């Protein structure tokens, strides 16, 4: 599954999806289920939980990867996205937040690295 916090994360989310599709992997995408409207995440949680691997694309403070990592047992690949304003620092806050997450087992890509996340997922899927 590919999960994105908001519509501003869509560019990176679609990069992940396109890269996986090129390699023959289809995946369900859940858009605009960020922590600012956590009720939207909860309404999709059962569907997200059906997947073996979850890629989370999130900007701002990047908390979505930690929240999903705390709720679900699957491997999580976090992709910080360079959206936000002020102290968000072009994705640095989202990156640092994901790296410092207290949810164990979250792997983190570099900022906006949707392709890298797709390739990491592909390695996991093919192993």
Region locations from a protein language model:
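Fold-independent oxyanion-binding glycine-rich loops
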Residues: 3-7, 32, 57-60, 79-82, ...
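Alpha-helix C-terminal capping segments
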Residues: 22-23, 67-75, 123-127
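Short glycine/serine/threonine-rich phosphate/pyrophosphate-binding segments
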Residues: 9-14, 38, 58-68, 88, ...
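Buried hydrophobic positions in well-ordered alpha/beta secondary-structure cores of metabolic enzymes
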Residues: 2, 20, 55-57, 68, ...
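Structural motif
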Residues: 1, 26-28, 52-54, 74-78, ...
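Glycine-rich phosphate/diphosphate-binding loop of Rossmann-like nucleotide-binding domains
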Residues: 1-40
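C-terminal binding/interaction regions
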Residues: 4, 45-49, 53, 83, ...
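Glycine-rich phosphate-binding loop
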Residues: 43-81
């Amino acid at each position: 599954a590919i999960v994105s916090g908001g519509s501003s994360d869509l560019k990176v989310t679609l990069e992940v999806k396109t890269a996986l599709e090129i390699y023959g992997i289809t995946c369900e995408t859940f858009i605009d289920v960020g922590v600012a409207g956590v009720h939207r995440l909860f309404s999709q949680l059962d569907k997200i939980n059906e997947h073996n691997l979850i890629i989370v694309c999130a900007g701002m403070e990047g908390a979505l990867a930690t929240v999903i990592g705390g709720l679900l047992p699957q491997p999580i690949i976090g992709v910080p996205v360079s959206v936000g304003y002020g102290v968000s620092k072009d994705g640095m806050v989202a990156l640092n937040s994901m790296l410092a997450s207290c949810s164990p087992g979250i792997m983190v890509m570099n900022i906006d690295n949707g392709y890298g996340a797709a390739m990491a997922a592909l390695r996991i899927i093919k192993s």
